[in-house]
């Protein structure tokens, strides 16, 4: 039995409340594959679903990678760690490729508003970034390049079409700066991008409308937290606090 769009959206909302994000993602994938432009609510449901689905694997991957490094003296344990990490990597890659296919086949093509276009291009940058975290060699270069390209395109549209206080423009600056810091190892560029986004938003705080006030100020706080972390002397810590945007 095929469900219509409103039933699938309702199913996604139920799954979100039950914290069953795989079900939520499957429902929103089916909505997207119907080929219509998504409403803001549907777009956010899709984003939240996949962010949680991929986030669980990214977190598992980090834990296992760290354990693997600590078991270097024990070959058997290390082999087990490696095999388990590769299993998680395969899941993570499948999820990212699913999202990237939805973006290229439906979402970016169907986006009529600049806001949607930026949202989806940012998402494309994010999921190529997640792929690059677990990639190596030539594959790593390709995913890094694709990520940067998507972020850059989104960034240019956002500067032209959106207020500096818009939560989507701020969220893009946040993640693009994390990309520079973590993936390209360019702390100067990361700090410059984050600082400019923060300063431009501060200068136009009076343009903030009530509905996005909370989202925008939360992302501004994350930008500032990352700047503090990145400019502090002990740069050994990961700057991944910059993933808390909506």
Curated annotation (Swiss-Prot):
Top-level division of the source organism's lineage: Eukaryota
Transmembrane segments: none
Localisation: Cytoplasm; Melanosome
GO molecular function ontology, one term from the record: identical protein binding
Record PTM 3'-nitrotyrosine, positions in chain: 84, 106
Keyword Membrane found: no
Swiss-Prot/TrEMBL site (Interaction with phosphoserine on interacting protein) positions: 58, 129
Annotated positions of the N-acetylthreonine modification: 2
Processing and modification events after translation: Isoform alpha differs from isoform beta in being phosphorylated. Phosphorylated on Ser-60 by protein kinase C delta type catalytic subunit in a sphingosine-dependent fashion. Isoform Short contains a N-acetylmethionine at position 1.
Chief place where the protein resides: cytoplasm
Residues bearing PTM Phosphoserine: 60, 186, 232
Cross-link (Glycyl lysine isopeptide (Lys-Gly) (interchain with G-Cter in SUMO2)): 51
Keywords from the named record: Acetylation, Cytoplasm, Isopeptide bond, Nitration, Phosphoprotein, Ubl conjugation
GO BP terms in the entry: negative regulation of DNA-templated transcription; negative regulation of G protein-coupled receptor signaling pathway; negative regulation of protein import into nucleus; positive regulation of transcription by RNA polymerase II; protein targeting
Residues with PTM Phosphothreonine: 2
Complex and partners: Homodimer. Interacts with SAMSN1 and PRKCE. Interacts with AKAP13. Interacts with SSH1 and TORC2/CRTC2. Interacts with ABL1; the interaction results in cytoplasmic location of ABL1 and inhibition of cABL-mediated apoptosis. Interacts with ROR2 (dimer); the interaction results in phosphorylation of YWHAB on tyrosine residues. Interacts with GAB2. Interacts with YAP1 (phosphorylated form). Interacts with the phosphorylated (by AKT1) form of SRPK2. Interacts with PKA-phosphorylated AANAT. Interacts with MYO1C. Interacts with SIRT2. Interacts with the 'Thr-369' phosphorylated form of DAPK2.
Protein name: 14-3-3 protein beta/alpha
Lineage, highest ranks first: Eukaryota, Metazoa, Chordata, Craniata, Vertebrata
């Amino acid at each position: 039995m095929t469900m219509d769009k409103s039933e699938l959206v309702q199913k996604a909302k139920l799954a979100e409340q039950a914290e069953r994000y795989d079900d939520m993602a499957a429902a929103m994938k089916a909505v997207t594959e119907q080929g219509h432009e998504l409403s803001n609510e549907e777009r956010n449901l899709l984003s939240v679903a996949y962010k949680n689905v991929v986030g669980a694997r990214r977190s598992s991957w980090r834990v296992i990678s760290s354990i693997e490094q600590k078991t270097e003296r024990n070959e058997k344990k290390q082999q087990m760690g490696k095999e388990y990490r590769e299993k998680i990597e395969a899941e993570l890659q499948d999820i990212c490729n699913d999202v990237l296919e939805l973006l290229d086949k439906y979402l970016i093509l169907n986006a009529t508003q600049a806001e949607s276009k930026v949202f989806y291009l940012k998402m494309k940058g994010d999921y190529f970034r997640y792929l690059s975290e677990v990639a190596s060699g030539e594959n790593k270069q390709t995913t890094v390049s694709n990520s940067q390209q998507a972020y850059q395109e989104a960034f240019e549209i956002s500067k032209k079409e959106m207020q500096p206080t818009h939560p989507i423009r701020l969220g893009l600056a946040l993640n693009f700066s994390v990309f520079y810091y973590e993936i390209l190892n360019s702390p100067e560029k990361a700090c410059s991008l984050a600082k400019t986004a923060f300063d431009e938003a501060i200068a136009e705080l009076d343009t903030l409308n009530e509905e996005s006030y909370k989202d925008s100020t939360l992302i501004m706080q994350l930008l500032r937290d990352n700047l503090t972390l990145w400019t502090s002397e002990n740069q050994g810590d990961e700057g991944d606090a910059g993933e808390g945007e909506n």
